[in-house]
Every structure is written in C-alpha cells, then in structure tokens.
Amino acid sequence: ASDVYKRQLMHRGISPKVLRYCVGSGILYQTTRGNYRNCVFVGKDENGVPRSAFQRGCQGSFRGDVAGSQKQYGFLIPAEIETCDTVEIYEAPIDAMSGATLRQYKHDAPWRSVHYLALGGLNHQPIDYFLQQHPEVKRVALCFDRDEPGRNFTKIVAKRLTERGYIVQDTPPAIGKDYNDYLLAARRLISMER
C-alpha cells in the first residue's frame, strides 16, 4: 500500500527512472490520512530545505498547496551539470516529470541535460527565484498547457523574459492539453508501432 503513489504516477506514464530520482532526492513522497493517499511534490530552497509542497490525491481530483508553502519555491528536477544553461518550465509537477520522461524516451540527450521547473500553477514567483539562483541559465522553454490560461501566460512570460535578455522558446505540448496528455499519447503510439 505504501507505493500507491508510485503506481499511480507510473499509470500516468512517468518512467521508473524519473520516479526513483524524485523520491530519492526527497522532492516526491506519499502521505496517508485514513483511506486517503496524496502525492506530495516538494519545492526546496538553494540550501535544499523544503519550503513549499503541493498535494495531489492518488485517487480522485483532490489537489492543493500544503499550509505555509512559500510559492516562490517551485518543484525542481535540476540538471545533472551545474553549468546547464537551459530550463524547461511547466505548470504542474506531473507535467515536468512527463517532460523528463519524454526526453528519456527520445534518447536525444541524457534526461537530466536540462532543468525541469514546475510552478504549481500560473505563477511568476518560482520563475524569478529560479533565474536569480541560476545566473548561468540563458535559455528558457515555456511548456505551459495548451489551453487559454496557459497560452495567455506564455505570452506574458515570454515578453518579460525576452526583455530581460533570455532566449525564450514556446513549446506547448504537441498533443493534448498538457505534457502528461502528450506523454500518454506518445506511449500509445510507441506501443502501437511495436
């Protein structure tokens, strides 16, 4: 029963390698209260101290911030190389994990060849904090949802970051509303080809 969240995320297409990394680095765990289990996605500060947490029900549609969360600390899967100059920014942790899984499956580069940042919604604070902490980052891929709020936020963020000198790429999911939809569709296509 303790691995319900891992099974649920694997059902959402997240690769075991990405899951192991997130659990092992303390940015993903499960809570249980009675019959309810939640995935908890953790945002840490520059010293690795947990500062924010976003919960999502393992079953059902429950989701929300943990009380006391500081929203500037997003869910981050850091690049393996500290001098990495690229970040992919997503709305939700599951989308960031989906982006990492897609990169792993494409084999075009090691899956941690970029930073993956999830905002926990459409919020500028984690972007500003991350870029302040990572002055080596020059390239930003905006991977927000393919819906009206996501597209509008992309325009606003792209303008702000371009004005600040960043190279900005608009990369909405090729299929579906978000990157998890895209991952699941890509996995179906791969399994049909086999």
Residue map of PLM features:
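Residue-level preference for alpha-helix termini and adjacent loops
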Residues: I27, G74-L76, D178-L183
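Short, small-residue-biased leader/transition segments that mark boundaries at the very start
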Residues: A1-Y5
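Short glycine-/small-residue-rich flexible loop motifs, especially phosphate/cofactor-binding loops
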Residues: K6, A96, A158
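TOPRIM fold recognition
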Residues: D85, T101-R194
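Helix N-terminus capping/helix-initiation residues
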Residues: S15-P16, G26, G68, H134, ...
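Generic structural signal for bulky hydrophobic/aromatic residues embedded
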Residues: Q8-R12, K44, L102, Y182
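Phosphate-handling DNA/RNA-contact segment within nucleic-acid enzymes
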Residues: Q30-Q133
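Electropositive nucleic-acid engagement tracts
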Residues: K6-G34
